[in-house]
Regions:
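Structural signature of hydrophobic alpha-helical transmembrane segments
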Residues: 1, 41-58, 101-113, 176-190, ...
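Membrane-interface interhelical linkers
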Residues: 1-27, 143-184, 191-204, 253-273
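Cytoplasmic-side transmembrane-helix entry/capping segments in multi-pass membrane proteins
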Residues: 18-28, 74-87, 103-109, 128-140, ...
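Hydrophobic/small/kink-forming positions within alpha-helical transmembrane segments
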Residues: 29-37, 59-64, 89, 111-115, ...
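Helix-helix packing/entry segments at the starts of transmembrane helices
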Residues: 52-57, 124-140, 191-225
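C-terminal transmembrane-helix exit sites in multi-pass transporters
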Residues: 58-80, 218-237
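Hydrophobic transmembrane alpha-helices of multi-pass small-molecule transport proteins
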Residues: 77-94, 235-254
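Glycine-/small-residue-enriched transmembrane alpha-helix faces in small-molecule transporters
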Residues: 98-123, 263-273
Length: 273
């Protein structure tokens, strides 16, 4: 009932929008669709913890793009946190070594697409409202799924040996009751994420909010080990730690900056009496 009422309100808001705004909202939604597909395709070949950690170069990209496109100011501390986390990503990917896998570039592409998606979110903060934004985003999900539905059901790809492509284009596995339960939980979680994340990026500076997304890294490590038995390598542990440290450092510096700003504000005369 809640979902139906939300999208009912969303459709009414979409109808009110001018064509230009609908186009921009749709471009934003397709950026997220591309990020989602690249992310899940990379999971066909890579451990969950590595995919999530590489994907979390996205807050770094959000910080940089917010400075270039949105003209938000980033100081030396934010730049330092970006560089620290970038070293972590390099340690995980290890380009030029036998540990590097081309599928890692898919996770990196997902990060870039997601960063552009959030820049759209921030730049469109004064256009439409949250109902319309999330509704168009979910219509983009639906439209992009239709071609894959026909491929998967009516012309599934024969196994190629490429785990990522097979994961995307193989024939359907009919879900069990347990599978459907997990799918429904995931769908509801994504809806909640869409609403809360979109609202946050519309109301707070993108470069300030981005580091908070790093909380997903320790969770991905835990679930990767607990469910799939994917234990990261030593260098991957170091890389993940650096990415997490970079995010925490950025959050800490923003908190220090807020305290410094507050302390410089003169106390009102009435409060001093």
């Amino acid at each position: 009932i809640l979902v139906v009422s939300f999208f009912g309100a969303g459709i009414r808001e979409v109808i009110k929008l001018p064509g230009r705004v609908i186009l921009l909202f749709s471009l934003r939604g397709m950026c997220l669709v591309i990020a989602m597909y690249l992310y899940f395709i990379s999971l066909g070949s890579l451990p969950l913890s590595e995919v999530v950690s590489i994907f979390f170069v996205s807050p770094l990209l959000i910080t940089l793009l917010s400075s270039i496109i949105l003209k938000e100011k980033i100081g030396i501390h934010r730049i330092s946190s970006v560089l620290i986390a970038l070293v972590g990503v390099i340690l995980i990917m290890r380009p030029g070594t036998e540990n590097f896998k081309p599928e890692m570039l898919l996770a990196l592409g997902a990060a870039l697409s997601y960063a552009i998606f959030q820049i759209f979110t921030r730049s469109l903060k004064s256009e439409g409202n949250l109902y319309a934004l999330v509704t168009i985003q979910n219509f983009c999900y639906l439209i992009s799924a239709i071609p894959l539905l026909f491929i998967n059901w009516f012309n599934p790809l024969e196994p190629t040996g490429n785990l990522s492509m097979d994961f995307l284009l193989r024939g359907p596995d009919y879900p069990t009751f347990q599978d459907m339960t997990f799918i429904i939980i995931c769908a509801f979680s994504v809806l909640v994420l869409s609403i809360t994340s979109s609202h946050a990026y519309r109301t707070v500076e993108a470069s300030l909010l981005a580091p908070f997304e790093y909380v997903a890294i320790p969770f991905s490590i835990f679930w990767g080990i607990a469910i799939f038995g994917d234990w990261p390598s030593n260098l991957s542990w170091i890389g993940m730690s650096l990415i997490l440290f970079g995010g925490i450092y950025a959050i800490y510096r923003e908190r220090v900056r807020e305290i410094e700003i507050i302390s410089k504000v003169p106390m009102p005369a009435s409060a001093a009496m």
